[in-house]
Each structure stands twice: as structure tokens, then as C-alpha cells.
Amino acid sequence: MAALPTRRFGRTELEIPLLSLGGMRFQQSWTDLPAGEITAESQVNLEATLQRAVDRGLHHVETARHYGSSERQLGWALPRCLDDHRLLQSKVPPRANPADFEAELELTFERLNCQRLDLLAIHGINLPEHLEQTLRPSGCMDVVRRWQADGRIGHVGFSTHGPTDLITASCNSGAFDYVNLHWYYIRQDNSPALDAARDQDMGVFIISPTDKGGHLHTPSQRLLELCDPLHPIVFNDLFCLRDPRVHTISVGASCPGDLDLHLEAVSRLDEAADLIAPVSRGFSRQLSMP
């Protein structure tokens, strides 16, 4: 396959690959383990996954402060898997006390062993109070703006598992450059939020399309039949990526081979309309059956 296509990531003006490497499945643990407890086997697998991503053009790597050992392990791996086009993103949750938020931000930079993040997301604006903690005067966003002024953070966005109206309100605040949100074939209710992000010229990053999109990495036999001749991962990726409001989707790879079906989807993107239509009709017939 040729170089992975990119899309303009909204007003960030970054050219972001259609596939992003999500760092929530290749780490050893969901606990932030001490360095001495991370095994060589786990680290070798993470580095192999990262290197395959680099080789195939997944230049955007995304993790989070509360993804267990992910930040620490990536901090070791990134210098060993060099990428001149890398875009690094992490996510830190809002706090009632901005000093607590800044302390976690410092820890993210320490774990990742980096001097700058291209992208920082406020992690989990799921309730109105999370948005208020972020945007109020002297809140968490003021910390981010200071770090941006110091050149340590490029662009700021937010991630969310919250209701559509809250996501839309967060987009319409004008404070964020991009959004990480759920939207895929089996869950299209966030479409108004995609519209709001487009209207604000925000980058749009679809999170967890394989897991929350229907546990597509372990599909049922019935799901395989409904998506035939496509794998469910390929079908869902094509559904997401054919929408111009979407700029990139997360690939939460646990090992190098987990990239394969997503790469297949991108290679068939020009055929998306013809490939998706018969599968969608099959789903519609299934849903209409008594």
C-alpha cells in the first residue's frame, strides 16, 4: 500500500493520517506500574507494534495519563522507533483544583520523556462540571494556555464519553481545536456533535471504533455473516472514513497484527460506497425481521 492518506485536522492545520495508533491496548497493565515491574516481553511487543505503525504511516500516537503503564512504556519506546512525522497526543482529565491538573500534566511529560505534545486533550468531558472546571476563569484551560505559550503544547482538544448535547456545547464553546468522540455504524447519535465540530473547524478523531463499535475484534458468527464479504472491522472503518466530517480513527492495537484489517480498509476506501451499501441493506433487513 502507498503512504497512508492524510486529512487536514481542522483548524490545527495538521495533516493527520486516516489511522491513528491508540495506546490503550498494547501496554502491560491498566495500573501505572513501577518501572521495575514492566516485563521485557511486554515492552518488546509494544515496540514492535509501534514500529509497524511507523512503517505503515500511522504517525499519530495517542495515549493518556490514566492508561496504566502506557505513557511510561511509550516514553521508553518512542526514542527507539523514530518517526520524523510523528504527532504525539496524550490526555489529562480536568480537576476542580487546577494545580492537581497541572501536576498530572507534569507527570504525563515525565512518563513520556518528552518536551512537547503536539496534541493535548482534556480527558473525559463527560459531565457539565467537567466543562466548567476546564473553562472557568483560572481553570484548567488557563494552565494549558500557559503551557502553550511556553511552547510545550501545540493544540488542545477534548475527549468525551458524554451525552451529545454536552459534546455539542463543548464544541460550540470555541475553546477547543479538536474532539475525540464515539461515532460509528452502530452508534450514530453523535452526528450533531460532528456537525458542531465541522462548523467550528475542529479536528475529529473517532475513538474506539473497534471495541465500542461492537467488539469487532471478537465478532460473533452472525456479525461475520452480516458483513460478508468484509470483515466487520473493515466495514466499520469504511463507514467512518467515508464521512468527510471524520479526519482519523483510532486503532487500539494490542500487537502488530492488529493493524492489518484497518490498513485493508484504507486501501479500499475508494470503493467504500459500493462495499458499504449491500452490508447496510443486510443490517436493515435483519432489524426489520420480527
Spans of model-derived segments:
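Structured C-terminal cap/extension of enzyme domains
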Residues: 9, 54, 192-290
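Glycine/proline-rich, positively charged
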Residues: 30-38, 51, 96-192, 198-206, ...
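Alpha-helix-loop-beta-strand connector modules within alpha/beta enzyme cores
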Residues: 71-90, 140-151, 206
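N-terminal binding-site loop/beta-alpha segment at the start of enzyme catalytic domains
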Residues: 1-86
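Short hydrophobic/aromatic-enriched beta-strand-loop microsegments
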Residues: 84-88, 175-183, 269-277
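Short catalytic-loop micro-motif centered on adjacent basic/acidic residues
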Residues: 59-64, 90, 154-158, 178-181, ...
